[in-house]
Swiss-Prot record:
It comes from the Bacteria. Belongs to the UPF0346 family. InterPro entries: UPF0346, YozE_SAM-like, YozE_SAM-like_sf. It comes from Lactobacillus delbrueckii subsp. bulgaricus (strain ATCC 11842 / DSM 20081 / BCRC 10696 / JCM 1002 / NBRC 13953 / NCIMB 11778 / NCTC 12712 / WDCM 00102 / Lb 14). NCBIfam families: PRK13672.1. Pfam families: YozE_SAM_like (PF06855). This is UPF0346 protein Ldb1277.
Length: 76
């Protein structure tokens, strides 16, 4: 079975401190979230965590876009 990285590991590849883009800002902020579920892959669990704990995420649409990119990358 192929290795599947966690969503957090994928998200960290999107970090860019010089970018104002939504995905980069999400990644930059998640990096400093000490309670982010770093090993999680499940969309529902991640979504619930972010809805309850991530004041730094202005819209869940940003998470949806990031998770879609994650799923696409994990298919290859």
């Amino acid at each position: 079975m192929a290795y599947r990285q966690s969503f957090y590991q994928f998200l960290m590849t999107l970090r860019d401190p010089d970018s104002n883009g939504d995905l980069a800002q999400f990644a930059n902020n998640a990096q400093f979230d000490s309670t982010f579920p770093r090993q999680e892959q499940d969309r529902t669990r991640l979504s619930e965590y972010l809805e309850e704990n991530a004041a730094y995420l202005p819209s869940m649409t940003i998470f949806d876009d990031a998770y879609q990119a994650y799923e696409e990358k994990m298919q290859y």
